[in-house]
Design a protein with these regions (language model features):
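Amphipathic alpha-helical dimerization/coiled-coil segments
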Residues: 1-18, 90-113
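N-terminal helix-turn-helix DNA-binding core of bacterial DNA-binding proteins
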Residues: 13, 17-58, 77-89
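Residue-level detector of secondary-structure transition/capping positions
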Residues: 42-43, 67, 98-101
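Alpha-helical residues within the helix-turn-helix
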Residues: 50, 67-68
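Residues within the DNA-recognition helix of helix-turn-helix
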Residues: 62
Length: 113
């Protein structure tokens, strides 16, 4: 096993640049789906599981990672957790990333027309 890696990908240790940690957290389709769900408002773990149709342990890992980088927060309600977005500015960041990608594609796809 290479230094700094484990079987699930790169480690997000405390020495990593916080910006890298944030971008790594966003670099996953399922975590982006979770954020999109939470844009609609607070969701329970069960609602997130139902929407994603993934193994609960996988969803739990995604939620933990998103919490650890400060993108979402959780509160206990009875025996379940309810999740919300911690900072709405993340959606502006995602929108900007989408605009950059669209501009790049528009520029490069004109060569194939």
């Amino acid at each position: 096993m290479r230094h700094g890696m484990h079987h699930r990908g790169p480690m997000m240790g405390p020495m990593m640049d916080p910006r890298s940690r944030l971008f790594m957290a966003l670099a996953n389709d399922q975590r982006l789906k979770i954020l999109t769900l939470l844009k609609e408002g607070e969701k329970s773990t069960a609602e997130i599981l139902e929407a994603l149709q993934l193994d609960p342990s996988v969803v739990s890992r995604h939620l933990t990672l998103l919490r650890n980088v400060g993108l979402i927060q959780a509160r206990k309600e009875g025996v379940s957790q309810r999740y919300t977005v911690a900072d709405e500015r993340i959606f502006e960041m995602i929108r900007l990333a989408s605009a950059i990608i669209k501009d790049w594609l528009d520029k490069h796809l004109e060569f194939f027309e």
